[in-house]
Amino acid sequence: MSKRLLLFDFDETYFKHNTNEEDLSHLREMEKLLEKLTNNNEVITVVLTGSTFQSVMDKMDQVNMTFKPLHIFSDLSSKMFTWNNGEYVESETYKKKVLSEPFLFEDIEDILHHISAQYNVEFIPQRAFEGNETHYNFYFHSTGNHNNDRRILEVLVRYANDQNYTARFSRSNPLAGDPENAYDIDFTPSNAGKLYATQFLMKKYNIPVKSILGFGDSGNDEAYLSYLEHAYLMSNSRDEALKQKFRLTKYPYYQGITLHVKEFVEGKYDY
């Protein structure tokens, strides 16, 4: 039997921010299933997230998650960590691919200043940045007009591309701690992002797209979910536009993942 690849967004997909006592039994059931499938050598489990690696570790500790996905792609999949001998180790091979082109904070600041001056808007850093980052993320608060927001952000993406930089935007997720009525603005190297990480794994493990199941809940999952044949948007997603585009999990959070992973490995989605 060939291996299958399971891909999970983290915040509000693999991890529920407001996990309560009732949720814990569903969480344990999900982890038990993933552990069993991993031990049977049936699946490779991967987290793809916009969060930092340390943020993922901290959140896993909050709910005492015990299962360790084989790979965690953090910082909008610009960093790759692999579980090896009881700890996560960053992949130097992936790092070299990501940093194969210049990626300078000064250039990104110039891009944002250009758009800020043109439209009299502000881009707010989401965290304190350190040297040699591979992911710079900002908030853009809505102007109050959705069409105007998109126009400004699409100009930003095009202008960044003209400067040989990759920018993405998606609606912020308040359930994951983001502000209301805002957008996430993400800058990564060209060789990064959830779709890039997916294709990297397909090549690494020689896994066809039909053998991949992906889950997500927000805009930064759209590109990679669109690429897959078997993709689910979490039914707990707050993105109404994405809900019209993707199949929804039958149940939210841990229950939804457990059900659809079971059906996937049982071959119910094969055709």
From Swiss-Prot:
This is Uncharacterized hydrolase SAR2294. Belongs to the HAD-like hydrolase superfamily. One of its GO terms (molecular function) is magnesium ion binding. InterPro entries: HAD-like_sf, HAD-SF_hydro_IIB, HAD_sf, SPP-like_dom. The keyword Hydrolase applies. It is an enzyme of class 3 (hydrolase). GO terms for cellular component: cytosol. Pfam families: S6PP. Keywords: Hydrolase. Its EC number is 3.-.-.-. The keyword Hydrolase applies. The lineage of its organism: Bacteria, Bacillati, Bacillota, Bacilli, Bacillales. It comes from the Bacteria. It comes from Staphylococcus aureus (strain MRSA252).
